[in-house]
C-alpha cells in the first residue's frame, strides 16, 4: 500500500511539474515549448512590403515542433503518461493562429494581418 501511495504522489508531482499551462516558474521551469519554423514560398505580390503575406498564395505550411525546455520534466511526464509527446505538429492544430491570420482589409498601412 505504501508503494501505491508513493507512486500516485510521484505521478501527481510529475504531472504538475510538466504541465505547460499551470506553471509559473518561467520558460525554463519544465514547460513544453512550441517552436514555429519560418515558412517559405510566400505571396506572389507584396511579400515584404505588405504585411509579409502578399496577395498570392500563402506559401507552404509552417510546421510546429514541440520541444521540452527541461529534459527531466519531459521524462517525468512520459513516465506519468501526461506529457505532450515531442514531435511535429501541423499548423492547423493551433486554432487561434488561423483565426488571427484572416484578411481584414487595409488596416494601418498593411495588407494581410492588420495592425491590431
From Swiss-Prot:
Task: Give the primary localization class.
Answer: secreted
Among its keywords, does the record have Signal?
Answer: yes
Subcellular location(s) per record: Secreted
Recorded GO cellular component terms are: egg chorion; extracellular region
Quick one: a GO biological-process term for this protein? chorion-containing eggshell formation
Family under the similarity heading: Belongs to the chorion protein S15/S18 family.
Task: List the protein's name.
Answer: Chorion protein S15
Which gene is the coding source of this polypeptide chain? Answer: Cp15
Per the entry, what this protein does is: Chorion membrane (egg shell) protein; plays a role in protecting the egg from the environment.
Q: Which Pfam families match?
A: Chorion_2
The answer to keyword Coiled coil applying to this record is no
Tell me the keywords, alphabetical order. Answer: Secreted, Signal
Signal peptide range in chain numbering: 1-18
Amino acid at each position: 500500500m505504501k508503494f501505491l501511495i508513493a507512486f500516485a504522489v510521484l505521478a501527481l508531482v510529475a504531472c504538475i511539474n510538466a504541465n505547460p499551462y499551470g506553471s509559473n516558474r518561467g520558460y525554463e521551469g519544465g514547460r513544453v515549448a512550441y517552436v514555429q519554423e519560418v515558412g517559405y514560398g510566400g505571396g506572389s505580390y507584396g511579400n515584404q512590403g505588405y504585411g509579409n503575406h502578399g496577395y498570392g498564395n500563402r506559401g507552404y505550411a509552417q510546421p510546429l515542433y514541440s520541444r521540452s525546455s527541461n529534459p527531466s520534466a519531459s521524462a517525468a511526464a512520459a513516465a506519468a503518461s501526461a506529457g505532450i509527446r515531442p514531435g511535429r505538429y501541423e499548423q492547423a492544430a493551433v486554432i487561434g493562429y488561423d483565426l488571427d491570420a484572416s484578411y481584414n482589409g487595409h488596416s494601418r498601412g498593411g495588407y494581410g494581418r492588420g495592425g491590431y
